[in-house]
């Protein structure tokens, strides 16, 4: 395990030196028990164990992509243009900067040929480590088997057709997963009216500020308060005032 951790750390360092954009934002896990009790867990995605698994997975996907690229085989390659702006270097960003940096990332692109993935700092990338859950990963593994003479090779046209057929449905799945998590998070907060919690100011709008509740890593609006000037990255205390999960409403006030 120690050796694997050293390999993972060196690989991450190499990616960062190649311009990777490392986003370090806590993950919020919403768990619904059989009795409909909702539990919220805040997970550190940068714990040693999670970092090791993440980096080794990225390495495996990169090595697979490099093999396919070297052998000039079509595959579902992922690339990503440079972000619209960089807010920090390597892993130096604050929670505010990491959250805002994620908003500035360019959308990833799926193609049959390898191109640079700026977000990961790699010259080629595919996903291949979850063939049971993800069809794209299964297609990648089939291409590897084809390279070994174990089954027919997908042509570039067939790969492109797969991308066109599944890209939109997969995008819809991601939106549904986000909406489901936010719904149950708000459902939990419906029972926390009057709770005080810390928030970070993200931006100012005409009639309110956009803030993120640190404990729950979710955004909401904070009404402007007379005589109080808030700037992005300010830390404030707010009180949960009203929540309606079905209508996607979360209201808070200062104090």
Which stretches of residues belong to each language-model region?
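Electropositive polyanion-binding surfaces
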Residues: 1-251, 255
């Amino acid at each position: 395990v120690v050796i694997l951790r050293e390999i993972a750390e060196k690989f991450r360092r190499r990616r960062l030196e190649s311009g990777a954009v490392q986003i370090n934002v806590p993950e919020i896990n919403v768990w619904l028990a059989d009795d409909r009790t909702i539990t919220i867990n805040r997970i550190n995605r940068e714990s040693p164990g999670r970092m090791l698994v993440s980096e080794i997975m990225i390495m495996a996907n990169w090595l697979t992509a490099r093999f396919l690229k070297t052998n000039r085989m079509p595959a579902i390659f992922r690339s990503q243009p440079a972000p619209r702006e960089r807010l920090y270097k390597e892993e130096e960003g604050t929670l505010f900067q990491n959250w805002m940096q994620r908003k500035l990332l360019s959308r990833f692109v799926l193609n049959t040929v390898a191109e640079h993935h700026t977000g990961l700092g790699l010259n080629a990338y595919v996903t291949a480590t979850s063939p049971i859950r993800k069809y794209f990963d299964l297609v990648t593994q089939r291409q590897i088997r084809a390279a070994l003479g174990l089954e027919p090779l997908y042509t570039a046209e067939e790969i492109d057709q797969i991308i066109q057929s599944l890209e939109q449905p997969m995008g819809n799945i991601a939106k549904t997963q986000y909406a489901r998590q936010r719904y149950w998070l708000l459902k939990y907060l419906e029972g926390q009216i009057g709770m005080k919690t810390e928030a970070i100011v993200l931006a100012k709008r005409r009639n309110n500020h956009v803030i993120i509740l640190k404990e729950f890593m979710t955004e909401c609006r904070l009404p402007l308060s007379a005589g109080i000037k808030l700037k992005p990255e300010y830390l404030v205390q707010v009180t949960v005032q009203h929540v309606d999960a079905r209508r996607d409403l979360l209201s808070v006030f200062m104090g």
